[in-house]
Amino acid sequence: MSKSNGVSLAFPAEAATKEYAASLDSSDRLAAFREKFIVPSKANIASKKLAKPGLSPESCIYFCGNSLGIQPKATAKYLEAQLDTWSSIGVGGHFTDLEGSPLKQWQLLSEQAADSMSKIVGAKPEEVAAMGTLTTNLHLLLASFYKPTQTKHKILMDWKAFPSDHYAIESHIAWHDLDPKESMVLIGPDEGEYEISTQKIFSYIDKHADEAAMILLPGIQYYTGQLFDIQKITKYAHSRNMVVGWDLAHAFANVELKLHDWNVDFAAWCTYKYGNAGPGAMGGLFVHEQHGEVDYSAGEDAPKFRHRLTGWYGGDRSVRFKMDNKFKPIPGAGGFQISNPSAIDLACLCAALSVFDETSMADLRRKSLKLTAYLEFLLLRDYEEESRPFSIITPKDPEARGAQLSLLLKPGLLQNVAQKLQEAGIVCDKREPGVVRVAPVPLYNSFSEVWTFVKIFKDALQQ
């Protein structure tokens, strides 16, 4: 494909030169965003002692944003503001907006984060909540949306789901005294393939339509990097009377999303990958507005709302401190909150999101498409397909993938290649038995880094 999303993805012969990569960087309108991050140095990633960043002037090549994003420079500033608030006014931080702080008072802080995240996932602010972590949020959403009956009890899911998703779904099926072997349906690719076609998913939906209560898929498959057609799959599953949920761990802050317009029922994501909010950072969830309504037609003391597991922080602020044990949920996703969220975690999240507030997912996606296409172009050069010591198991179609390319090495190569990359100061992710996952991130990676990575990677393969 020579063009995608209005971006030219065709490269001339001279594109294989270091000078061409540098020319792409010089014309990159997003290049300045790299200065908003602390890129680990080669000396730091090799060191076994705790040290301040910048042990050496030469930065590593960090292509591991699909596992953990690097630290925004704003994080320290936001954390310091939060610690100063706590130390200077104590409990007053819950209700006081301090002049000069980038953060709202604590009781409004989750809304600050949700507002920024809503732009990233294509939702209304009230459809998003900043809370919990990914699997915890999936459990809460499954508790509300998975309502099995004697006839409709199956959940359709990815054949190679991230283990935590698998455990969560399996446990909810068992919680309802059902047999996961009967109620879990795994959708996999054709024999010898890695990509699951949309038509294959449709065929599973049709086959199990009378028995399936839900389909829950990853927006992007973590192992292969495949981006599923969320809009088409959601619409098709709805036509077969299924609830549709999405795990957006690898899609959040990576690709453009329009969860509201696509009529997705629910979704959850982590924020520490492409979102750069820090290890184990607070997650997010989406509940479509149709499921977040609160109906007071029967009276102020008799609200009707979607059944869910409840906690005091999901209660409307107007009644939150009345302590009368009459739960009145916040309309929207906020009503799914359980406990008072960590203001420290929210500071890290808001710091990371402040970077996204300065750009758009459309602009980031345009650069990402070209960055990953350039990576693919350089990787495939100089090899005949039958002699290439690796294959790319990520879809060739740029619209069917995010930033990541998954490189499946021939048997016996992984350990040596991984060691050579590490010695060269390259950080990327390996998955047994033979996959290297490479994810150039548009916020802080460059075309020159892609060029250097490919050269070192190919040298490692030859050794």
UniProtKB/Swiss-Prot annotation:
Gene Ontology cellular component annotations, sorted alphabetically: cytoplasm
Molecular functions per Gene Ontology: kynureninase activity; pyridoxal phosphate binding
Pathway annotation from the record: Amino-acid degradation; L-kynurenine degradation; L-alanine and anthranilate from L-kynurenine: step 1/1; Cofactor biosynthesis; NAD(+) biosynthesis; quinolinate from L-kynurenine: step 2/3
Annotated EC: 3.7.1.3
Keywords: Cytoplasm, Hydrolase, Pyridine nucleotide biosynthesis, Pyridoxal phosphate
Cofactor(s) listed: pyridoxal 5'-phosphate
Entry keyword annotation includes Nuclease: no
Subcellular location: Cytoplasm
Principal EC category: hydrolase
Reaction(s) catalysed (UniProt annotation): L-kynurenine + H2O = anthranilate + L-alanine + H(+); 3-hydroxy-L-kynurenine + H2O = 3-hydroxyanthranilate + L-alanine + H(+)
Residues the record lists as N6-(pyridoxal phosphate)lysine modifications: K273
Superkingdom of origin organism: Eukaryota
BP-aspect Gene Ontology terms: 'de novo' NAD biosynthetic process from L-tryptophan; anthranilate metabolic process; L-kynurenine catabolic process; L-tryptophan catabolic process to kynurenine; quinolinate biosynthetic process
InterPro entries reported in the protein's UniProt record: Kynureninase, PyrdxlP-dep_Trfase, PyrdxlP-dep_Trfase_major, PyrdxlP-dep_Trfase_small
Binding site for pyridoxal 5'-phosphate: L134, T135, F162, P163, S164, D165, D247, H250, Y272, W312, N340
Record family assignment: Belongs to the kynureninase family.
Stated role: Catalyzes the cleavage of L-kynurenine (L-Kyn) and L-3-hydroxykynurenine (L-3OHKyn) into anthranilic acid (AA) and 3-hydroxyanthranilic acid (3-OHAA), respectively.
PANTHER family named in the record: KYNURENINASE, KYNURENINASE 2
Assembly: Homodimer.
Protein name in UniProt: Kynureninase 2
